[in-house]
Amino acid sequence: MPSEFSRTRRPGTVMTALVVLLGFLTLPMSMSGTTVAIPRIGEDLHATGAALQWVLTGYFLTASSFMLVSGSLADLFGRRRIFAAGAVLYAAGALGSATAANIAMLDVARTLSGAGAAGVMAGGGALLAATFQGAARTRAFAAMGTMSGIGLAIGPTLSGWMVGGLGWRVTFALFAVSGLLILVGSFFVAESRADRGPKVDRPGVASFIGGLALLMFGITQGAQAGWGSPRVLGPVAAGALLLVAFVAVERRSDHPVLDLTLIRDRRFLGWCLAALAVPVGSSGVLVFLPTYLQGVNGLSARDAGLTMLMLTAPVLFLPAAGGRLVNRGVPARHLAALAVLLLAGGNAWLTVLHPGVTPLALLGPLLAIGVGNGLVAGIIDAQAMSLVEPARVGMAAGFLNTVKGGGNALVLAVIGAVLTSLVQARTGSAELAGRIAAGDLSGPERALHAAQFTDAWHLVLWSVAALCAVGALTVHRLLAPAARPVKVSGEESRSRTGRTLSAKI
């Protein structure tokens, strides 16, 4: 390994990969599996609206808030140590979720799980980047994408089966067991850290976590309190100010939690944008469509989970295929742009959604979204990490995962709030809109409410499709190789200059 790293022991790289991949199997499963349990959780704990949505949003909020911090701490104090600490928090939060007596306790437990997930993801990504190089690194990150795809794919189906037969608490208990297995495995993983003294950028940590948390909290209150309410504008404004302060602090810090030179690299920024496009184009459908299918079409949790396999199954196989294509010479920028275009097309196509829609009608759009997600999932991390020197891989992995997790949190907060707001504009009742958005369409006006919910979905899908289309073009442009200077002879240069001046005159 390069001299920038100090190692305390050298267990096999295979064990490192296996333990990290177990983490990247469990965390996506926790995200996608929880989606099908939301209607049942709402019924059992008598919850609707923002409190119920927080079961999902709170997880992503803390995961994204702590991701960047976890990556930098991993570089300073040890990547394995942060990975293991994340596993402890994740398991504790999952156990708390399984035993929660009310929605408030469940929300708190889910936010704790999110903080743990940040340590597992940022520490795990940094461990892979520090352990593997070159084509082996590409294969390792492709395997990571494949495992994430497996978690996404089996999460709704497994959770749907357990929710229907055993209850949603068993789902969280399973996640707690997985967290403990990750913790045990971490003791067999090599430790690595950057060769510099541990110094924590406390102002940077505080301003980043506080800013992102306040911003997300304000957005989640939009539908219930009104977008012009002080309950929304206050936290959003305070969060934005703290994030501006974070940038100012990082510019002056000798040991920043985020070295801003990372995002000055146009190609690294391009891969971060590609990472953001994935949750924008897929997370809203993955999280909220099962609620629509259960509430409007009357599907069981198990059947809704099986339907989502049409989206999640491609993510099982395509990350590894994407990595192989890049290793065989296919330009990564073309693959990334194609993937984001597929996300755009899939969301536009999904406007075929209507009450009584058949699974066959959903096959095309869900496959398009799944293929777009899978193609790019296996190449983003490896391509981005290849642009970063070894001493900053933890910070870079943390930032990249912050973009992914923050994108997920923002997408869920915005789509959840916008769906509820659009339904409320049609029903005139915030309470009724919250119940409809949570999948509760019981009552004599069920058909009318289903139509209103569907109209709201269509507006959201068209908006997401437009964002992804713009994102695809931007990603392709940012990832373009730098133009090579053309050597021109002195005589030809003088001739060209003369022609240019003549043309201007």
Where would I find each of the regions flagged by the language model?
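Intrinsic disorder in cytosolic terminal tails and internal cytosolic loops
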Residues: 1-12, 441, 445-450, 478-505
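Central cavity-lining transmembrane alpha-helices of secondary-active solute carriers
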Residues: 57-71, 124-125, 309-321
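Helix-loop-helix hairpins in multi-pass membrane proteins, especially solute transporters
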Residues: 67-204
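Phenylalanine-glycine-rich, low-complexity intrinsically disordered regions
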Residues: 170, 192-195, 209-235, 247-248
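Short, Lys/Arg-enriched, Gly/Pro-containing loop segments at transmembrane-helix junctions
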Residues: 194-199, 255-261, 427-430, 482-492
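Structural signature of hydrophobic alpha-helical transmembrane segments
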Residues: 57-58, 111-118, 169-180, 235-239, ...
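A membrane-interface helix-boundary motif in multi-pass transporters
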Residues: 164-176, 221-232, 300, 421-465
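12-transmembrane solute porter fold
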Residues: 13-29, 34-38, 49, 55, ...
